[in-house]
């Protein structure tokens, strides 16, 4: 059995680790609230752009945007959203497993894939598996800006417009709640027809008629680009909210485990110390009896 000094050293080490994980848990909780607020704030913009584009598309059905053209899928673009840092449980592992399954499925059908990495972990993963990475953006920080994302996203959007890829997929982690995050692989392009359909309530709300400059088609084309960019930004915002939630939960679990380990070590320490005292008393009694 280890000596009391060695056990005290272990207890001190675990206590120091618990202080670190507790601090990281508190920081993640603070960042999580901000990330969730940012995620909620991003949703109305994308929805407003979608409604305006849907109204214009309904009013001008003769306009056919390249983003809505369906082709036989021979080449695919994949935008992979991950975190820059670790210590967030199985968040990245789960989404990258979904990406791996999708890549295997596509490659099994003879489909070529080119990837865009958003986040360091995704960039490292795509490099390890030898994927063709055509653009990337890393080190977004705690506050993602659309300006940083546009360059990497535009590579895939232009590739689809020019016919270099026939579909674009978006992989990210969807925020469900603090305890649950779900890996997603969704088709980004071509836009499904239901994306630009309107409910009766939306039709009444957007029943206005304006004069557009330079013309309605140009406005629709620009709006659809903004809408797709907003969808990617929303995915990044959801991924960041998921990251901070997963990190908070992971650090809380680490802190709780450290507390349990400290309790177990303290019990071992007490037993060891008690055994040492009992042994000393026995030796004293034996010595006294011998005299």
Swiss-Prot record:
One of its GO terms (cellular component) is plasma membrane. Keywords: ATP synthesis, Cell inner membrane, Cell membrane, CF(1), Hydrogen ion transport, Ion transport, Membrane, Transport. InterPro entries: ATP_synth_F1_ATPase_gsu, ATP_synth_F1_gsu, ATP_synth_F1_gsu_CS. It comes from the Bacteria. The keyword Cell inner membrane applies. GO terms for molecular function: ATP binding; proton-transporting ATP synthase activity, rotational mechanism. One of its GO terms (biological process) is proton motive force-driven plasma membrane ATP synthesis. It is a peripheral membrane protein. The keyword Transport applies. It is found in: Cell inner membrane. SUPFAM superfamilies: ATP synthase (F1-ATPase), gamma subunit. Belongs to the ATPase gamma chain family. F-type ATPases have 2 components, CF(1) - the catalytic core - and CF(0) - the membrane proton channel. CF(1) has five subunits: alpha(3), beta(3), gamma(1), delta(1), epsilon(1). CF(0) has three main subunits: a, b and c. Produces ATP from ADP in the presence of a proton gradient across the membrane. The gamma chain is believed to be important in regulating ATPase activity and the flow of protons through the CF(0) complex. This is ATP synthase gamma chain. It comes from Cupriavidus taiwanensis (strain DSM 17343 / BCRC 17206 / CCUG 44338 / CIP 107171 / LMG 19424 / R1) (Ralstonia taiwanensis (strain LMG 19424)). The gene is atpG.
